[in-house]
C-alpha cells in the first residue's frame, strides 16, 4: 500500500520562479478574430492586401501570413462554438483595432475611399492627426476597428 502521509513533490511549495526549470518563452504569434460572415471578412481583408488562401471564404477557419512571421486568424462563430458551446459574441463597444501602416498619406486616403466605396463602414475620415500621421478608421464586417496610418513627414 502506498504511503499517503507525504505530499507528492509536485505539490510542494518551492522558491518563486519558473515551474519548468527555465523561463517559458511565449511569443506573439497571431491575432485571432471571430467573424460572423467568413466570406465578407476574407473579402474585406484581401482588399487590404492580406494573403488568404484560395477558397478561404468557404472555410470555417483560415489564416493569412503577415510580414515578420505573425498571422491573422479568422474563425467563424460556429467554429468557436464547436469547442466552446457557451461562447457568446462580445457586446458593447470595440476595444481593439488592427493598425495598418500605409506607404504614404495618399495611400491612407486611397485605401479608405476604396473600402468605403465598396460599402464598408468608414468610422473616421482621413485627417492629419496632431501626432504627425495621416490617420483614418474603418470597420471590418464585424465592426472591428481597422486603423490606417502613415507618417506625414517621410
Regions inferred by a protein language model and the residue ranges of each:
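Core segments of cupin and vicinal oxygen chelate
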Residues: 33-81
Amino acid at each position: 500500500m502506498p504511503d499517503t502521509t507525504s505530499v507528492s513533490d509536485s505539490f510542494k511549495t518551492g522558491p518563486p520562479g519558473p515551474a519548468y526549470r527555465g523561463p517559458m518563452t511565449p511569443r506573439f504569434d497571431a491575432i485571432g478574430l471571430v467573424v460572423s460572415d467568413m466570406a465578407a471578412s476574407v473579402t474585406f481583408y484581401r482588399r487590404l492586401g492580406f494573403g488568404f488562401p484560395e477558397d478561404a471564404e468557404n472555410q470555417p477557419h483560415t489564416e493569412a501570413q503577415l510580414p515578420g512571421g505573425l498571422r491573422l486568424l479568422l474563425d467563424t462563430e460556429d467554429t468557436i462554438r464547436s469547442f466552446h458551446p457557451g461562447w457568446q459574441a462580445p457586446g458593447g463597444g470595440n476595444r481593439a483595432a488592427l493598425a495598418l501602416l500605409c506607404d504614404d498619406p495618399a495611400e491612407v486616403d486611397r485605401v479608405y475611399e476604396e473600402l468605403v466605396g465598396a460599402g464598408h463602414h468608414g468610422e473616421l475620415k482621413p485627417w492629419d492627426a496632431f501626432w504627425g500621421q495621416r490617420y483614418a478608421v474603418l470597420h471590418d464586417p464585424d465592426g472591428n476597428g481597422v486603423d490606417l496610418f502613415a507618417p506625414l513627414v517621410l
